[in-house]
Amino acid sequence: MAVPARHTSKAKKNKRRTHYKLTAPSVKFDETTGDYSRSHRVSLKGYYKGRKIAKANEAK
């Protein structure tokens, strides 16, 4: 079995884990629909860059 040669200190462990973080998704306001949507993605109403591209899913 592999066993670590030395004990990993709290400081060493925490320095390694500083890059494990969540980033908030980038959200922009769409003037066409008046809703917020993520960048470079089609909005829920089917608009992309101010143009209607897709048919929006209607709730039944």
UniProtKB/Swiss-Prot annotation:
One of its GO terms (biological process) is translation. GO terms for cellular component: large ribosomal subunit. One of its GO terms (molecular function) is structural constituent of ribosome. It comes from the Bacteria. Residues 7-20 have a biased composition (Basic residues). Residues 1-21 are annotated as: Disordered. SUPFAM superfamilies: Zn-binding ribosomal proteins. Pfam families: Ribosomal_L32p. Keywords: Ribonucleoprotein, Ribosomal protein. The keyword Ribosomal protein applies. Belongs to the bacterial ribosomal protein bL32 family. This is Large ribosomal subunit protein bL32. The gene is rpmF.
